């Protein structure tokens, strides 16, 4: 890493550098930073930082979302799309990160993408737990289809109606070529 930094910033060649390891803490006086490695929570070299004085987790790509910084909008919709688009295939690594983070007293989460989270943190952690365990958020049936001539669409709609008639309480159907699947 130092070699790469010096290639981009040769003026830092003579500056003192510190290599940190997973779980190490750097005491800066009024702030203490603990480094939490989170490999494959998007990239192999991902590292998060926990600041224990203010109880802030700088979470890198974890707990991020697409869209504006507004926390008044439905966080879960764009966070879900972000999670499954960016880190969704690394559920085991996210599970390991959640276990590490469980031991930290976190009052604020600062992701690289999306709003700073400082209320209802259990809501966000629980969603990440559900997503990373590949568990459904709700019980129901999701029918995804695409149809060039309309025949598959008719079959999908018929199947959806049959499921409702049989008592399935939640049936969602979407045309993968035309609908916004983030919704």
Regions found by a protein language model. Name each.
Residues 3-5, 66, 118, 180-181:
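Generic structural signal for helix capping and beta-alpha/helix-loop junctions
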Residues 121-183:
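N-terminal beta1-alpha1-beta2 submodule of the flavodoxin-like/Rossmannoid cofactor-binding fold
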Residues 27, 50, 134-137:
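Short, flexible hinge/linker loops that cap or flank conserved catalytic cores
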Residues 1-119:
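Metallo-beta-lactamase
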Residues 9-12, 50, 71-74, 124-126, ...:
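Short, glycine/charged-enriched secondary-structure capping and boundary segments
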């Amino acid at each position: 890493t130092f070699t790469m930094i010096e290639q981009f910033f040769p003026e830092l060649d003579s500056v003192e550098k510190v290599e940190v390891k997973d779980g190490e803490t750097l005491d800066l006086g009024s702030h203490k930073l603990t480094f939490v490695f989170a490999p494959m929570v998007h990239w192999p070299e991902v590292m998060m930082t926990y600041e224990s004085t203010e109880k802030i987790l700088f979470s890198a790509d974890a707990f991020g979302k697409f869209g504006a910084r507004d926390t008044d909008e439905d966080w879960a919709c764009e966070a879900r799309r972000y999670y499954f688009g960016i880190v969704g295939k690394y559920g085991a690594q996210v599970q390991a990160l959640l276990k590490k983070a469980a031991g930290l007293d976190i009052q604020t989460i600062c992701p690289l993408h999306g709003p700073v989270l400082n209320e209802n943190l259990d809501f966000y952690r629980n969603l990440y737990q559900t997503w990373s365990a590949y568990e459904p958020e709700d019980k129901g049936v999701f029918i995804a289809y695409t149809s060039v001539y309309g025949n598959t669409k008719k079959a999908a709609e018929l199947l959806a109606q049959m499921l409702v008639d049989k008592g399935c309480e939640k049936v969602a159907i979407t045309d993968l070529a035309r609908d916004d699947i983030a919704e």
